[in-house]
Amino acid sequence: MDKKTLCLYFQVHQPIRLRKYHFFDIGKNSDYYDDFANRTITRKVADRCYLPANRTMLELIRKYGKNFKVSFSISGMVIEQFREYAPEVIDSFKELVATGCVEILAETYSHSLASLVDEGEFKKQVKQHADLMKELFGVKPVTFRNTELIYSDEIGEMVARMGYKTMLTEGARHILGWKSPDYVYTNSINPKLKLLLKNFRLSDDIA
């Protein structure tokens, strides 16, 4: 029986929460962030989600070796909060990367929509994120995942020009039609960029 390959990728992101900012605060208070909510939520998801999940991933890697591999897309925003409130989460990702069975993906630093509005800002954030991944994990990402898997051939061509070999995107039914998301496609402007599509049915089943 032919072996089937399943590509698992996990998005890791937490937004920075803003506090309630009243009209009379204008000009008097520049403390925009809700530090209490950011700390509380980051600690909660670290203890209930990220740390247990990473322990499970590590156990599976130790059990199955190179036959079990995963990838993570970790935003700059969540790294900032991990550094402040839950540094042990970063350590757990470092331990996973050190196994050689984990790929770190590139994305925009701020989990932003810059690819839709400003090419310069988009490139700046992608480089900022890639530099952070290199600093933390000692790896240079070669696969790109845009915010919410946003894709167009023009965005893909930009990504290819930045040196990325592969890009993840949504396997949207209204785009694919009769085609399957379970194949490797290419960018129509720059065919050197490979496209891996999300199988939304399978993702929904295991989420």
What are these regions (language model features)?
Residues 207:
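Binuclear metal-dependent hydrolase catalytic cores centered on His/Asp/Glu-rich metal-binding motifs
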Residues 1-142, 149-204:
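Catalytic alpha-helical scaffold of carbohydrate-active enzymes acting on polysaccharides/glycoconjugates
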